[in-house]
């Protein structure tokens, strides 16, 4: 196999066909690692350019266009895709002038199927859930993650479960989760406690966790960088500014740029 799970703290390795979130040895976060040397001969800019703009699945997806760098050993018919990605770059002359820089672009991840970058990660996470034979997927969320999980669970035939707190909930996103048929459970606790409950449900009931602790989500989110650089003629920008929450995107972007 050309991919494995590796602990980011102690370096312990695991096969990708196991249901794991933290490292069994030290409790550290896991990362999906690919054998890039083995993949080098099958990956090229020309390959990704040839797939761009086509209608064939899964290459039409802005995530799975880069499949060799996301999940190389995966069979194409296992992929759960809407498709997502292929979000536009918008140049802003006025803001460029205001900021005193030559060129400024905005990458509009709101153009994804459920309206956020979470769809890039969820296609990877839900695909892995199906690979593992899981029947139910769950997350703790106050907004975008719940909408994305519910949508991709519905598209893949899995049961989606969302735990959300009793305040600071994005009702528009929650309505998407309800519309896509997810079981939505309101809990009188903050986000961290809801995430603990999701982990407990996973262990006791065999439900697959799809919060950012799931490393396969970051594999999808790193394609924002692949796509951005491809849109710029395979040139990396001088600076990249990204909002930070739990910094999952920061980690994913670092993987993509590496």
Put a short name on every predicted segment.
Residues 1-258:
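PLP-dependent amino-acid enzyme catalytic core
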């Amino acid at each position: 196999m050309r991919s494995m799970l590796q602990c980011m703290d102690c370096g312990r390795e695991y096969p990708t066909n196991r249901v794991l979130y933290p490292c069994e040895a030290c409790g550290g976060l896991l990362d999906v690692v690919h054998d890039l040397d083995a993949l080098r001969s099958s990956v090229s800019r020309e390959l990704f350019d040839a797939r761009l703009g086509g209608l064939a699945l899964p290459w039409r997806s802005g995530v799975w266009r880069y499949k060799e760098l996301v999940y190389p050993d995966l069979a194409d018919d296992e992929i759960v895709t809407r498709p997502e990605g292929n979000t536009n770059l918008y140049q802003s002359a006025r803001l460029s002038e205001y900021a005193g820089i030559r060129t400024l672009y905005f990458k509009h991840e709101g153009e994804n199927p459920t309206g956020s970058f979470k769809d890039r990660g969820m296609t990877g996470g839900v695909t892995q859930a199906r690979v593992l034979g899981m029947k139910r997927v769950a997350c703790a969320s106050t907004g975008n993650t719940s909408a994305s999980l519910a949508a991709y669970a519905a598209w893949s035939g899995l049961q989606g479960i969302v735990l959300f707190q009793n305040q600071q909930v994005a009702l528009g996103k929650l309505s998407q989760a309800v519309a896509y048929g997810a079981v939505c459970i309101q809990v009188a606790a903050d986000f961290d406690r809801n995430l603990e409950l999701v982990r407990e449900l996973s262990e006791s009931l065999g439900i697959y966790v799809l919060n950012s602790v799931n490393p396969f989500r970051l594999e999808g989110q790193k394609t924002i960088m692949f796509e951005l650089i491809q849109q710029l003629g395979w040139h990396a920008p001088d600076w990249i500014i990204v909002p930070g929450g739990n910094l999952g995107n920061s980690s994913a972007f670092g993987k993509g740029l590496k």
